[in-house]
Amino acid sequence: MPHPAAGSPTPLAIALPDGRQLGLTRYGNPAHRAVVFHHGFGSSGRELPDDAALLVRLQLQILAPDRPGVGQSSVYRALTFPSFADDVVAMLDALGIGGPVGVMGWSVGGVHALALAARHPARVAAGQLLSTCLPLGERAAYHHLSPLWKALRWGQLSFSWLNRTTFLWLSRQWARHPDRTIAWFIRLMFPAEKIVTRRWRALLRDAAGAGFAHHGRGVFDDAQAWCRPPGFRIEEVQAPMRLWHGQADGVWAPSNIPYLAERLGGAPVRLLPAQGHMLYLENWTAILEEMAGLLPVS
């Protein structure tokens, strides 16, 4: 397991075709095989361990784009899963990466990873869904949501002004009192998430601070996109997918993960005992080793 020490990931900014800016963080050597990482809700591309030696050994680079309104990325209120998939392809084109890449997504980032694979199948070689969620606005998936997630979707769509105000308030807390704010979130977590977040406190604190940039606008727009019809079908994904999920996940319980795997053609699922929503931090080496084996050798 990599040690959660400060590293030197490289921040970049790409000009998109419509004039917006897309910010991203690159981990590793730009000459190595590329993996796109989609960050979680309320976070940013800064949420990854910086383990340079591991990336060199596996000959991988990770590109972690910030969704619109996050970090250095311009606000885009019309955000959808397909629109961000197109942004990612524009990013790859701007970086001179024409071949198929690996794709990862943590939490709601898993839905963005699926959207990229479904919308641009020629650009995705393989994918990993890490503690993923389902698209809340898809009619078929909705029937598999827990009562809590159905209620959260209803609240986001029915009282959007209240959620916008909440995210604005949270953005101010992250900007003014980051240590106090992450301590508050830790107190609200389930045991499995609490243990890991304490260990990676500084990394996750800074990632959330960037996530709530632009007055929390990006977080709100991401939530709206998540709650609306996704604009793609899960069955359109052609690349092989692997699912990692914790049996003790207190954010997204694993009960509907077999359903998602079935819709992905029987994708393999790793259900990890006693692990929670932050399992990507606990299993980073194994996750990257699996991805390296899924990608063609350069």
Stretches found by the model and what they are:
Residues 41-53:
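The serine-hydrolase catalytic nucleophile loop
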Residues 55-74:
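Conserved alpha/beta-hydrolase
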Residues 237, 243-245, 249:
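Short beta-strand/loop motif that positions the catalytic acidic residue
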Residues 250-256:
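Conserved alpha/beta-hydrolase "acid-adjacent" motif
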Residues 267-298:
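Catalytic active-site module of serine/aspartate enzymes centered on a nucleophile-bearing elbow/loop
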